[in-house]
Amino acid sequence: MIIRAPIRTKTKSFRGDQMDFKFPSNESLPRGTLEEYHLNNHHLLNDVFAAENGVSRDEDGNSQILSDYTSTSNTNTNSGYSSNGYYSFANISDNTTSSPRIVINQNETARLTSSDSNKSDFFASHDFPGNDSLHYSSSSVVKNQLHSMEAIPEGNITGSISTAFQTIPTADNVSYDIAPSSASSLLPRKSTSKSAILPSTQEAKPMTKLNMEKDIKTIELNNSVVPKPKKKLNRVPTIRRVESSRFSNSRYSSSVSSKSSSSRCSLKRSKAIRCKGGLLYYFTSLGIKIKKKLRKLRLVLRRRLFSYNVQKVPSATNSKTTKSKANINNKSKKRGTNLVNKNSNSTPRQKKSQRYVSNLQRSISSKSLVPVLAPQKKTKPLTVDTKFKANHPQSEDSKVGSNTPRSPLVSYTPSLRRTNSSIRRAASILTASATMTPANNKNSFISVPDNVSHAVTRNSSMYSRSRLVRSKPSTALNAIARQPSIVVENKVIPLSMNRYSIKEEDEYVIDTSSMRELSPVNSVCSSDYDRESSESYSNYADAMETTEVDNKDRVECNNEIQNVNANNEETSNEESYNLMKHYLSTVIAQRIMLRVQIARIQNNKSNVVYMNKSAETNSTIYEDLADSLLTEYEADGSSSQIFDGVSVRADEEEEEDEDDEDDEEEEEENDDEEDEEDEEDDEDDEEEEEKRKEGEGRNLAKEVDELAELSPMRKQSDLSITLRSPFAMLNSAYSNSIISLPTGVVKRSLTLPVGMKI
């Protein structure tokens, strides 16, 4: 069962804020025997508790049970009752329930009907006095089953109606108190006007004795039709607006008076609680939408009236497509006129927009472009080839600024707005190899002098086969004409034909062939390193850079290492061949032996005989198994013991295999003979069993002693595990289930089978 306990801070439905409100369940109800129908509506519960406990206005103990959220019209619960613990949306209107209307016939009762159910509630229709009000009462169908309804005593009594089938709750979170408008037309105009003027917080006055007597007389006349009510209301309930703490503005607080035409109106009123689907929510959301549209319209009008554009913008009647096309055309025309009029771009921002780099000569220096690690004393800076003109195939996009004189560095490719990380990945590096950017390439506009070409092309394929790839020095990003590229799924895909070599910052390709010990020429002391680095920037050696001395040392070292390796490989190959041969021969021999033993044990014919023999002759199966295991695994497994007598050991094992096969045949013959003898001696089995049990008790102690004597064969550090049946000492018949072997004796190999059936 799901029990939800919401926090309702803004409601005062049961004399105060209900912070600890819980929905009713079987646990919170009294233990009295009540029918399920009595638990059906909250007003019935009010009557029951008022009858049993007596009503006190300050008592709030029943507020957990007197709930507004259950009714028979509830479709969100399983059974329609309040005891299942689920939230029921009975009083929350979804704009599908119609307002109740009154069917009036003369000299008959006025019947309050609703279109969604066949239930009806009756009014008493008489000639009422001027100050009398309409009385609700329960129908005659439920007369014998239910208590007649009483007014619910609350702190703010606003004259709520309670009937057998329908309730109109009185809470501050209720948007309307609904009363049929035709009911008010039955009364004189004075009474309806007075009741309409009554404020929402006015409490119902107690009935006077005269009014009570008159009402009793008039009801007794029509007693055959209308049952007698217990209490009655003092005035006609009217449709009245109830303020909530949320919407307490003045525009929402206007009172709505009842009219005679409202019953025939097709408007669907919100029954109780303001919610998504009620009329109030609809109108508030409508107002919000209208406000947004008005703000947009105001902005559009201000743009139209106070725009400083030279050309007029098309009118607002045009569609969105024409607006977007006109804006694009205006921008392109302005850009073309600006480029034509201003031959010399004044501001650096305009230069930067046209990809003109102002600080190119200053930024491209010898330190930034020539590799730091290259041992060169004199370097020349890169020179920009101003005679070079970029030839672009004319397309539709490039015709925009075709009339403008082009600077030699400008390439009009559409710019991409990227993040810092994508710019860092896609940034061009000017230290690209000359082989990757030939002179006839249309994208290469930087000419490299011949002296620097070797240092610049150090990352080309002929130099970088066995080198560490390091992140190369580059100029500032704003001083470089960027490479045209596309960012797809956060990866930069270049569009140019290998214009520059792009290296990721974390791309370190380490070649193990370049790993070598530093020769004394290459080894750098800290003092030497500090002195040389202070003198010149590019004068120290690294594993990345190679010199002629390094090459000579490397060749000599490689030759020596190859000779030593060749000799070592020959000896190691012979040793490994011999070792594997010995190992495989021993393993194969042990496997063959173990399989023969397992086949002997698993034989069905010999199995029965082995069991009988084990009882007679001190469990020979276990002795055979232990002997075979001990003889085969007696060696410690050290390489000296294995490899010393390999040939002798293999010959012995082959002979043992042949002997085992012969033993199997002999044992099978013996088994057949023993089976015949057992059939003849069935009568003497009982006497033999008694003798057997006596002998087994003695043999048990002998077996344990014999097997315990095996442990000194191994080292004392080995553990010995004894597997013993719990019935061994109690019942000597199960003494053949004892296995006791030291762990040092039984050796296990990874290549041998582990599981055995015994």
Curated annotation (Swiss-Prot):
Listed GO CC annotations: cellular bud neck
Region listing for Disordered, in residue ranges: 55-77, 314-414, 636-708
Record keyword Phosphoprotein present: yes
Biased composition regions of type Basic and acidic residues, renumbered to the chain: 690-705
Main location: other
Biased composition (Low complexity): 315-330
Alphabetically ordered keywords of this record: Phosphoprotein
Residue numbers of Phosphoserine PTMs: S25
Localization per record: Bud neck
Biased composition (Acidic residues): 651-689
Polar residues composition-biased segments: 338-348, 355-368, 400-414
Sequence similarity: Belongs to the AIM44 family.
Protein name from the UniProt record: Altered inheritance of mitochondria protein 44
Gene name of the encoded protein: AIM44
